[in-house]
């Protein structure tokens, strides 16, 4: 049985463990902290965040494909994940004219123009789900061959005779595997040996939500399946389980309290409860990692030594581009930028399919757009162009 080590216990690690375990691999997850969930560990619920632009850009395409792919998996080979995903739809607010342009490239079953009960227009995604990270992990941990080790801080990943060796920060060997997935946010880039010139400038942004429980339960406890309300104000996320649970992003919370606006027709007593600032409790603050092109990194780590040796050829051969040297078997899945529920799902499937020699999950253009080597290629081309201007 083939073995994979996944470094990081967040959404990317969870999705990767699921994808490989579904294919019959032995899966070991290494997490530095004492709990699973990564940046969303303190949240009972998160939401899938697809989005469309009028030009149907690469990001839009990737998010829509991720939503469709994971829906098909939950309807088939990954049916055990269904309790963690409640399909309830989502509204991406925008004016009607822009919404009409955005939905033009996609099937009506994927997205359509819609008006909320409050009279706000936008793009409606009927298959969007609210997600329980805890339940997602619980389902994956029940799979045969999946194990987790907490409190393991990885210091490096070395190539071995038959795969890869994972070494902790004290120099101790902790695992050997055929494949290693680096799913540990910015640490993934460091473990791949990449520096800013290789991955571009990184942006870490803080994210906080506010929680309220009318039934007296702890605010960070998953209360069950939620309802993902249409987002009408354009100012963030609204998740609710009527009568017991509410979760709002900080900006929605502030806007709602100041303007006295509600996103649903709750009864007066519930609305009065939610309008009291003391009813809300701030959650833990998580950080989102965003790359400069706002796309994730998904795929094999670049072979930096081989790239340096072939730099001139890689930079100048544009008409018949040479493939970038890669470290097959060492994969990155990071840079989710607040879209982890979708990027993690499609990224894990792309990586597992590649490791197993299966057909590509996405087309070549999308795969290149999220390749961990993409910034290196651009850097080499810029350097070559500058050399031509300055002379030999």
How should these model regions be labeled?
Residues 2-28:
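N-terminal Rossmann-like FAD-binding beta1-loop-alpha1 element of flavoenzymes
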Residues 33:
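Residues in the short beta-alpha loop(s) of Rossmann-like NAD(P)-binding domains
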Residues 45-125:
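Dinucleotide-binding Rossmann-like beta1-alpha1 core, especially the glycine-rich loop
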Residues 124-163, 168-169, 175, 183, ...:
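Helical element adjacent to the flavin cofactor pocket in flavoenzyme catalytic cores
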Residues 279-392:
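C-terminal catalytic lobe of FAD-dependent flavoproteins
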């Amino acid at each position: 049985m083939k073995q994979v080590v996944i470094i990081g216990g967040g959404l990317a690690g969870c999705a990767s463990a699921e994808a490989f375990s579904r294919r019959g691999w032995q899966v070991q997850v290494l997490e530095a902290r004492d709990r699973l969930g990564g940046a969303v560990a303190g949240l009972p619920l998160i939401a899938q965040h697809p989005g469309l632009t009028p030009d149907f850009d690469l990001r839009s395409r990737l998010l829509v494909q991720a939503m469709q792919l994971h829906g098909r998996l939950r309807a088939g080979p990954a049916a055990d994940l269904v309790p963690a995903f409640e399909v309830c739809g989502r509204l991406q607010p925008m004016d009607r004219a822009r919404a009409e342009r955005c939905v033009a490239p996609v099937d009506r079953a994927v997205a359509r123009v819609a008006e909320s009960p409050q009279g706000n227009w936008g793009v409606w995604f009927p298959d969007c789900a609210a997600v329980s990270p805890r339940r997602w992990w619980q389902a994956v941990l029940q799979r045969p061959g999946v194990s987790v080790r907490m409190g393991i801080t990885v210091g490096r990943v070395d190539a071995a005779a038959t795969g890869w060796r994972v070494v902790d920060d004290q120099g101790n060997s902790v695992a050997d595997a055929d494949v290693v997935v680096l799913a540990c946010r910015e640490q993934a880039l460091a473990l791949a040996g990449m520096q800013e010139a290789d991955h571009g400038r990184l942006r870490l942004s803080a994210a906080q939500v506010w929680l309220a429980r009318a039934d007296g339960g702890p605010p960070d406890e998953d209360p069950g399946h939620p309802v993902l309300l249409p987002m009408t104000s354009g100012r963030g996320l609204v998740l609710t389980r009527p009568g017991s649970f509410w979760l709002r992003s900080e900006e929605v919370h502030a806007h709602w309290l100041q303007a006295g606006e509600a996103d649903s027709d709750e009864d007066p007593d519930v609305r009065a409860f939610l309008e009291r600032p003391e009813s809300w409790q701030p959650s833990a603050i998580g950080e989102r990692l965003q790359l400069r092109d706002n796309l994730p990194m998904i795929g094999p780590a670049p072979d930096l030594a081989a790239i340096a040796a072939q730099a001139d050829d890689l930079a100048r051969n544009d008409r018949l581009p040479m493939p970038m040297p890669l470290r097959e078997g060492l994969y990155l899945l990071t840079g989710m930028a607040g879209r982890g529920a979708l990027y993690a799902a499609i990224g894990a499937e792309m990586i597992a399919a590649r490791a197993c020699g299966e057909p590509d999950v996405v087309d070549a253009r999308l795969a290149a757009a999220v390749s961990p080597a993409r910034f290196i290629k651009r850097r080499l081309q810029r350097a070559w162009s500058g050399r031509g201007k300055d002379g030999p």
